[in-house]
């Protein structure tokens, strides 16, 4: 599930709120997989880096004086990454608003962790990010990205970007192009906005961007991200 309220996303309505599995259960599953010969695992969650916050909240509500010591995502990385036999580990998908320096530290300290971060941008325009209810600004996004790269040398970074969100202006698109160029992605999953029935964004019909304009903007974005990828892989 997911506790966020992104205006274009139907997941919280269909999957409910976040539920973290106990750390011990996840480590035990990783140990079973490793014993069966599995060498790579992926920590998967709709908002994977918010892992453990619901467990902390439940502990506090139960009067547990040590609730704040309950494991969070960085602890999960370290615990699963230490399982004997596992050689590679990834996680997806994190949310930028919940990204913390201790996650980057855990990535750097865990030999099994692949040097890859999927870091969804969605838009480089603060105005559009606000309409999306993403909970971060472009500047904060880039600051966290710089911290990740400082902690994990040679980090490969991929992202998600949406073009044509309702009300997106040419200035908004320009800002997205600027941020995408500054981020220097290795790869980008790029999308044209598609309304999902039941979401806030789907009701913004009066602000839908002309499809021809969206298509042209999408191609301009592809040029930027493909140029960055080419430079990275030369």
Each model region followed by its residue ranges:
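N-terminal pre-triad scaffold of radical SAM enzymes
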Residues: 1-7, 31-35, 39-42
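Short glycine/proline- and charge-enriched loop/turn segments
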Residues: 10, 57-65, 202-207
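Conserved SAM/AdoMet-binding glycine-rich loop
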Residues: 35-170
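A structural motif corresponding to the C-terminal lobe/cap of the Radical SAM core domain
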Residues: 115, 127-234
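Conserved functional loop/turn residues at catalytic and ligand-binding sites
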Residues: 1, 10-13, 37, 98, ...
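Short, ordered loop/turn segments at secondary-structure junctions
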Residues: 14, 46-48, 193
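Canonical Radical SAM [4Fe-4S] cluster-binding loop centered on the CxxxCxxC motif
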Residues: 1-24, 57
């Amino acid at each position: 599930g997911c506790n966020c309220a992104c205006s274009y996303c139907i997941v919280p309505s269909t999957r409910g709120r976040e539920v973290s599995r106990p750390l011990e259960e996840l480590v035990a599953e990783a140990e079973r997989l490793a014993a069966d010969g599995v060498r790579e695992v992926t920590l998967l969650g709709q908002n994977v880096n918010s892992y453990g916050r619901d467990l902390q909240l439940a502990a506090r509500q139960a009067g547990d004086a040590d609730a704040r010591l309950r494991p969070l995502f960085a602890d999960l990385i370290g615990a699963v990454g230490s399982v004997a036999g596992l050689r590679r580990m990834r996680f997806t998908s994190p949310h930028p608003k919940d990204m913390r320096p201790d996650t980057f530290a855990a990535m750097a300290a865990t030999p099994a962790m692949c040097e890859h971060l999927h870091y969804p941008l969605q838009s480089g325009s603060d105005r559009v990010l606000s309409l999306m209810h993403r909970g971060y600004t472009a500047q904060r996004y880039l600051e966290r990205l710089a911290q990740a790269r400082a902690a994990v040398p040679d980090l490969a970074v991929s992202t998600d970007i949406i073009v044509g969100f309702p009300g997106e202006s040419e200035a908004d698109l320009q800002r997205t192009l600027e941020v995408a160029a500054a981020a220097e992605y290795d790869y980008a999953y790029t999308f044209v906005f598609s309304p999902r029935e039941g979401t806030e964004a789907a009701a913004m019909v009066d602000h839908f961007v002309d499809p021809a304009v969206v298509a042209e903007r999408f191609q301009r974005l592809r040029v930027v991200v493909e140029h960055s990828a080419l430079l990275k892989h030369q």
